């Protein structure tokens, strides 16, 4: 009998996939906020066709399992464009055919013009991106969606770092994800979270990941929500 995939199984499978792809790596990295992070997630490395197809499956399954109602996908420029379009293809393969749209950084004054490309933004819209750092692209997306007369339904991301906003020394009280949820009253859905990553490291039998587990746990202790 086939075992049904649970959300936890999905997140652990995604973490393994991201590690194998080199998208998720361990070491010493400096974030934009100036913090020394023991891990790094770079969705820009989902740059092969088969790899993008796989990550789109994770996005699509996570979205469907969330139970969120949606009519259109929106991908903020630039990483969100590829992620939203690939997720739309994956959803169609699962029997859910929806439109997708994205924005340009600069408006066109010829052709179709404007800043929006793709399906008309209408009904309930899910914003798809890789992560939420400062929340800037989400806020810009909210403005575009509402200006089009549509309703933001959720934000779907690959990884929730579960990390307080601020800098290395000036640590905030909430994460960017929490701020988005509170400000707009919509859910932020993640394929995997920092908690899932720690669970993966706890369960791993790879001795080389032992130090990484300690470093990630210490980082969460200092900056985590």
Curated annotation (Swiss-Prot):
Question: What GO molecular function annotation could you give as one example from this UniProt entry?
Answer: orotate phosphoribosyltransferase activity
Q: Which PROSITE patterns match?
A: PUR_PYR_PR_TRANSFER
**Which Pfam families does UniProt cross-reference here?**
Pribosyltran
One GO term of the biological process aspect: 'de novo' UMP biosynthetic process
Task: Give the InterPro entries listed for this entry.
Answer: OPRT, Or_phspho_trans_dom, PRibTrfase_dom, PRTase-like
- One GO CC term, this protein: cytoplasm
EC number(s)? 2.4.2.10
SUPFAM superfamilies assigned: PRTase-like (SSF53271)
Instruction: Identify which top EC class this enzyme belongs to.
Output: transferase
Its annotated pathway?
Answer: Pyrimidine metabolism; UMP biosynthesis via de novo pathway; UMP from orotate: step 1/2
Q: What residues does 5-phospho-alpha-D-ribose 1-diphosphate bind to? A: 32, 78-79, 104-105, 108, 110, 129-137
Which coenzymes or cofactors are required?
Mg(2+)
Catalytic activity reported: orotidine 5'-phosphate + diphosphate = orotate + 5-phospho-alpha-D-ribose 1-diphosphate
Q: Which UniProt keywords apply?
A: Glycosyltransferase, Magnesium, Pyrimidine biosynthesis, Transferase
Q: Which residues bind orotate?
A: 40-41, 133, 161
> Whom does it interact with, and what assembly results?
Homodimer.
Purpose: Catalyzes the transfer of a ribosyl phosphate group from 5-phosphoribose 1-diphosphate to orotate, leading to the formation of orotidine monophosphate (OMP).
Give the similarity note.
Belongs to the purine/pyrimidine phosphoribosyltransferase family. PyrE subfamily.
Q: What is this protein's record name? A: Orotate phosphoribosyltransferase
